C-alpha cells in the first residue's frame, strides 16, 4: 500500500468516524428528549394516581352504604342468602328469597 492509498484510507476512516459521531450525537439528543418526556409522564401519572385515590376515598366516604349494598347484591347474585334467617346458605335453584329481596330493595 503506497502513501496515497494509506492517506486515502485514513481520510475515509476519519469521514466515517465523523458521520458516526454525528449519528451518536443525534441519538443522544433523542434519548435525552425521551428521558425528559418519560420524567414528565411519570410525574403526571403519579399525580393522576393520587387524584384517583383521593376521589375514590371521597366517594367511599360519601356513600359507604352503596358499597355494602353492592357487596350484598354480589353475594346474592352468586346464589347465597343475605337475609338474617338463612345468611350464607346457598339458595336452592337460585330461587328468590323474599327476606333477601326485602334487604336489597331497602333504600
UniProtKB/Swiss-Prot annotation:
Where does this protein hold Zn(2+)?
A: 81, 83, 97, 100
Pfam families attached here?
Answer: YabA
* Cofactor requirement: Zn(2+)
What are the protein's UniProt keywords? Cytoplasm, DNA replication, DNA replication inhibitor, Metal-binding, Zinc
* UniProt entry tagged with the keyword Membrane: no
Major subcellular site: cytoplasm
Lineage: superkingdom: Bacteria
Is Cytoplasm a UniProt keyword of this protein? Answer: yes
Example GO biological process: DNA replication
Comment on bound cofactor: Binds 1 zinc ion per subunit.
* Gene Ontology CC terms, in alphabetical order: nucleoid
Summary of subunit composition and partner proteins: Homotetramer. Interacts with both DnaA and DnaN, acting as a bridge between these two proteins.
**Family recorded in the similarity comment:** Belongs to the YabA family.
Q: Name the job this protein performs.
A: Involved in control of chromosome replication initiation. Inhibits the cooperative binding of DnaA to the oriC region, thus negatively regulating initiation of chromosome replication. Inhibits the ability of DnaA-ATP to form a helix on DNA; does not disassemble preformed DnaA-DNA helices. Decreases the residence time of DnaA on the chromosome at its binding sites (oriC, replication forks and promoter-binding sites). Tethers DnaA to the replication machinery via the DNA polymerase beta sliding clamp subunit (dnaN).
> HAMAP family, alphabetically?
YabA (MF_01159)
Q: What is this protein called?
A: Replication initiation control protein YabA
